[in-house]
């Protein structure tokens, strides 16, 4: 629980409470134009930092993370929301109209991702949407500041944009691929940022 608290406070401090990322996610959720009350799954939800963003967008929120410690913390932080660390428990609430994997795939190796994506496909509604947002590695980027910023994510499996797309395309139908940036302290135009890939898929 202490680690979950430290992780939560650290992320909020570095990103000014995820202000910029919340705004970007809210815009993407609005673009999907899902009916009010649609069931959304926050895959790899961590401490539930984006729970309120989903709810304020009119969606019924569910958070899933394999780390039972952060899930316990999230339940205390957002007592009105559903959080689970077991597949069986969260699948009970499906099928989901939307599954969002927001900056968590860079913590997962390819073979495990294949299993997770097959599971996502099973719990996704027939006309549901899957949205991947994740940090991309750019070997040509020599910025010491940006490299240091990326290390804060502690992800052992950062990939190129095309590698994320290829992995997802083996399991789901890729509809759109875009790019975005996540700036340190949520300051647009700052030289310290993470490049992101955004992949929208159907079943």
Task: Name these PLM-found stretches.
Residues 103-107:
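Short catalytic micro-motifs in class I SAM-dependent methyltransferases
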Residues 43:
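Conserved beta-strand/loop positions that form the S-adenosyl-L-methionine
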Residues 100:
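A conserved beta-strand element that flanks and buttresses the S-adenosyl-L-methionine
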Residues 1-37, 46-92, 108-112, 119, ...:
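Class I (Rossmann-like) S-adenosyl-L-methionine-dependent methyltransferase catalytic domain
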Residues 38, 97:
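Conserved acidic residues
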């Amino acid at each position: 629980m202490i680690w979950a608290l430290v992780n939560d406070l650290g992320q909020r401090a570095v990103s000014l409470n995820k202000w910029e990322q919340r705004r970007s996610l809210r815009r993407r959720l609005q673009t999907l134009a899902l009916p009010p009350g649609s069931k959304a799954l926050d895959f790899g939800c961590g401490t539930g930092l984006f729970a309120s963003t989903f709810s304020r967008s009119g969606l019924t929120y569910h958070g899933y993370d394999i780390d039972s410690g952060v899930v316990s913390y999230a339940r205390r932080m957002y007592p009105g929301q559903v959080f689970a660390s077991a597949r069986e428990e969260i699948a009970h609430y499906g099928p989901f109209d939307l599954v969002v994997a927001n900056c968590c795939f860079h913590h997962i190796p390819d073979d495990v991702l294949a299993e997770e994506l097959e599971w996502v496909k099973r719990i996704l509604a027939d006309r549901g949407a899957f949205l991947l947002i994740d940090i991309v590695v750019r070997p040509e980027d020599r910025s010491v500041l940006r490299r240091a910023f990326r290390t804060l994510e502690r992800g052992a499996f950062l990939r190129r944009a095309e590698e994320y797309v290829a992995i997802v395309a083996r399991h789901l139908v890729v509809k759109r691929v875009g790019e975005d940036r996540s700036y340190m302290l949520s300051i647009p135009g700052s030289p310290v940022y993470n490049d992101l890939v955004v992949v929208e898929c159907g079943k």
